[in-house]
Amino acid sequence: MAVPKRKTSPSRRGMRRSADALKQPTYVEDKDSGELRRPHHLDLKTGMYRGRQILKPKAEA
């Protein structure tokens, strides 16, 4: 069975765990509609992605 040769210091343990934190998602303002959306994702309100119509826009209710 594998046994560590040295005790892991709190600093090293913290550095290892630093990559485990959840990142806050980034948002960009859409040029056409002004709505916030994720980068590299299509805008669900307008149905546009990179200047092209991908989906039909949602009907205003």
Curated annotation (Swiss-Prot):
Pfam families: Ribosomal_L32p. Transmembrane segments: none annotated. It comes from the Bacteria. GO terms for molecular function: structural constituent of ribosome. The keyword Ribonucleoprotein applies. Gene3D superfamilies: Single helix bin. Residues 1-61 are annotated as: Disordered. This is Large ribosomal subunit protein bL32. It comes from Xanthobacter autotrophicus (strain ATCC BAA-1158 / Py2).
